[in-house]
């Protein structure tokens, strides 16, 4: 049985993140740093930063979520597009990394104190593509495995929080990238499979 593309992404992310943990110069060259992207045209950072993480916990959480949802979307694309499905999935994931970073690039291109790393924007895109296909699927939290919430409810809450935190938050998380990635996941799901709109609506209406 061949490895899933999702698992390959997890392995590559783990290798690159581990290198970043142990080599600060490597880390600094690959991180999302809008000032360098603007002044030195190092736009590659908006892609490479998606394979870096700041800690083992950061890496593990992102890759755990990606494995939970990514393989489902990957195989859904294979069902829809045949042999092209995995290629489309790779393009989806890679473009999600970049798209999620564009707003923070525009916001912080003159701010030398801002930088970010992590796959969270792309992972958000994958999760929200899942929500478009399975809006009523019960989702649980790692620490509360017996309490399930419909995916659409969690998704709405995530968007509201990410929007608020991108303006008011005082932590070091790139909430704007999370929000942008989530929106991109919805749009990609619709553009790649327009019939999903009717399926989504039918599932929501069927719940009432």
Give residue ranges: language-model regions.
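A detector for small-residue-rich transmembrane helices and their helix-helix packing motifs
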Residues: 1-208
